[in-house]
Amino acid sequence: MPSTTIHTFSDIDFDSPGKRHYELAFHHDGTWGNVLVPLTVVNGQRGPGRTVAVFGGTHGNEYEGQVAGWRLSLELDPAALAGRVILMPRLCTPACDAGTRESPLDGVNMNRAFPGNPRGSTTYRIAHFVTTQVLERADVVLDIHSGGRVLRFPFCSSFHEVPDAAQEREMAEVARLFDTPFVMIYAKAMASGLLTDEAEAMGKITIGTELGHGEATIRQGVRHAEVGIRNVLRHCALLAGDLENALSLIHI
């Protein structure tokens, strides 16, 4: 999968029809000098529409979102799409490479780093890019998490209570598209600096998930993620077709 290395973020083409793969270079005073974070932009050829942003690998030891996001970056066909999809399947790339929750470069938890800092350490600069370049463009934000090494959740999608009733109603509707046994609603913020909190505060339709656990990639969790994301694209009229049921696609 050929990609273009980007050192100046204004060189990213977010608008032309087609699919483009990038590696975003964030300077780091290490052996290779840069951390390369993958980003894929898919602009549909069926016309304008909403923008859906998909994140995996916010924590590096949570694998289901990384697998689902990477597959979708390869499979989504611009000819079948309206609107735009932005995918960052390995958001905290240093943590993904190391299989750790926090980045080994600066010890920072990406999901406590938002809205980021353009002059901070690597994790804060990645978070700042996401806030200013991706969330600003998005209408719908999907942050795919799982339990990682130490937590075990039932499969669930999630969102937070927000002051805007219309925003919360659509989030409740979208959360059900992942066809998980549970939808978890956070009554208050669990911490500061979350990607989902930042997106919700910007008025975006924002959904998180917990889709796996342990030192493995859970197949059913990947399917919930893949089918859920595609269902969201159908809900938003980016893709045509009927909604899928995640569990019906699991072959035991």
Describe the role of every protein-language-model region.
Residues 1-251:
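Structured catalytic-domain cores with a bias toward divalent-metal coordination
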